[in-house]
Amino acid sequence: MPRHYQKRLPPGPRSESPAKMTSYRFYQLGCGMVSTDLGHLIGLLGVNGYSVRSDLYFLHWPHFDPVKSSTSPNPSADVVAKHVQGRGDLPDVDVLAHLGDRSIGDCICESGATYARAQDAQRLFYVDWLGVSDEFQGHGWGAYLLRRALTAGRRLSYEHAAIAVEGDNHRALLLYTNYGFRVVGYGYDFCRD
């Protein structure tokens, strides 16, 4: 990213937009979130050489109840859901799709306990990655892989689902909100040049 590049905050009154959060690196910690209503903090970051590197929508689906998995967009494809032991009490889920030797896409989900120690995090199913190869996009694979992963997570006793999506990924945002997720926050990732 060029040194002079800086994203602007969305215009308009705060009440017209989702809750906004700002992500910045704390000393010896990962990322922290702070409301963008704290203008003095954003000002301090800017004065000290920080700029917005990326922005994310945070989505949540409490008590998620996915529609049962439907038929694969291509019945000839090999789709496998694997349970992988992660940091939580419940296993993580990886859903992988291949057609012959070509990768169609994958959906990687983790326990919220991967990122937080709170007991409630044990039952949070976090969709860490959903990707479909370019040649297979537009055929329903993203929705299918997400549905398969969420169905597997629900069977494992996860209660809530969450996902984050880049601010300019409108197709993904539309998919997630149509499927049942709701925007609960908006974050900015600051970096120092």
State what each model feature region is.
Residues 41-93:
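Acyltransferase donor/substrate-recognition loop-hinge adjacent to the catalytic core
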Residues 183-193:
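…primarily DNA-binding HTH/wHTH and HhH modules…
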Residues 77-79, 99, 107, 130, ...:
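Ligand-binding pocket scaffold of soluble enzyme catalytic domains
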Residues 22-54, 143, 167-185:
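Conserved active-site alpha-helix within GNAT-family acetyltransferase domains
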